[in-house]
Amino acid sequence: MPLEIIAMEQVKMMANKLWGGRFDKAADGEMYSFLSSENVALDTALIAYDIEGSLAHVCMLAKQGIIAKKEAGEILSALAAVQKKAGEGKFSLDPALEDVHTNVEAAVTAITANGKKMHTARSRNDQVSLDTRMYMRVAINEVSAALLELQASLLELSKKDCVFPTYTHTQVAQPASLLFWCHAHHCEIERDLERLSQLYARVNECPLGSGAVAGTTWNIDRNYTAKLLGFSAPTANPMDSVGSRGELEAELLSHLYLAMAHASKIATDVILLANKRLIVLPDEYSTGSSMMPQKKNPDPFELVRGKASRMLGLYVHAAGLLKSVPSGYNLDSQESKYALLQGVKTAEQSFSILAHALPLLKFDKEEIVLELEKGYACATELADLLAKKGVPFRSAHSVAGGIVKECIAKKKFLSALSASEVSAVAGVKITDAELKEAVSVDKVARFSAAYKIPAASAHAKALEARVKALDAAHALLEKEVKALVK
């Protein structure tokens, strides 16, 4: 028999040791690949968390007297060796071993036979829930950091403050300022950060000890493992802990979709304003055409917009997995891993691109004023002026609309009108100074100066606290491991 076939058979035997006791035949190769090949590739992102979870679990087994401290020390030493290898990028997962949990256990058992005791009072069901929650905590923190960076870039961009157009139905609406535009998007991101912070509290509960579905009769200490891993508390119910896999993932993806929708809105504004030549795209974040020499394309902004659509698809993928599954653990939920990992990566990349590109935008102030003049953006203020003079607003609205129609016909702007012309049409006396105040783009835009972007978000402090809590838990776990490793 060729050596590679012998090796594969040996690998299958190793994998089957986890659950092969009641089987007479080895798993079909195609079926095994269908179950594991893609999953194992994705599991690479969970290696560090799986090892860390095992370190805490073994410490707990020793603390509770379930395994001897000497045995625990040997297992922990082996786990540390695997951890070091993984940190150096030298620990690759074998698809034939089904998942990250089996790969880690096999690597530990190859170092010490006591590795076979590592899985006592534990199931891969609560393991994968643990790994996922640990990954999600870090992911939420990293995405939050990326959003805070995007907020900071909006603050930096707002310092270039100038008159800025607003639009409804993609038509010119009213004059505002660049600061006003930046503040609006800053507010959107604040909501994104708030949602992520709220989700973090739900994610930050430890499922370890839930077992396959109904817990375990071993005398485990779930509070201890939760503390070692930096969780606020153990989850309340084992069946819910393993049976709700995919729910938190779908919730995160829903929040990321909303954040990406906000990013898409920013990107689309940039694209449209560049098309109107009101802003100049930075060379560093533009591309050209292979055929047309004059082109300067907003490709990264278009791709951010496109990736928002991807995020929606990933959310629907994850949310769909929750439908029509019975209570307890089901392998359908494995599919949520792809959506989760892709979603986090997509969000971080998109927010980073915008954060770096936005401060480099340049603005053509003359073109912006012309855009507002051509769009008769001060017509609302003109109607308001007439209303302040005693004309009912509905009548003032009609008069202002008629004035705009007349200006369009005569190809002139509101700023070219005289007070006497407007007074004659409106039937009320207004002065030149009052009219100038009402139809001057610069003056009307002043109202938006009241909108200020805070220099620091409260969410930055919350993020810092979460990161510090995880660091403290790492230090505690390291201390407990060292106490058992001689």
Residue ranges and their predicted role:
Residues C59-I67, F180, A250-L258, E381-G390:
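Short, well-ordered beta-strand elements within core beta-sheets of diverse protein domains
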Residues R133-A139, S144-A145, K159, P165, ...:
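Charged, flexible cofactor/metal-binding loops and thiol motifs
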Residues S77-K85, G243-G246, G402-C407:
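A short structural micro-motif
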Residues C59, K63, K84-F91, T109, ...:
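Charged/polar positions within long, soluble alpha-helices
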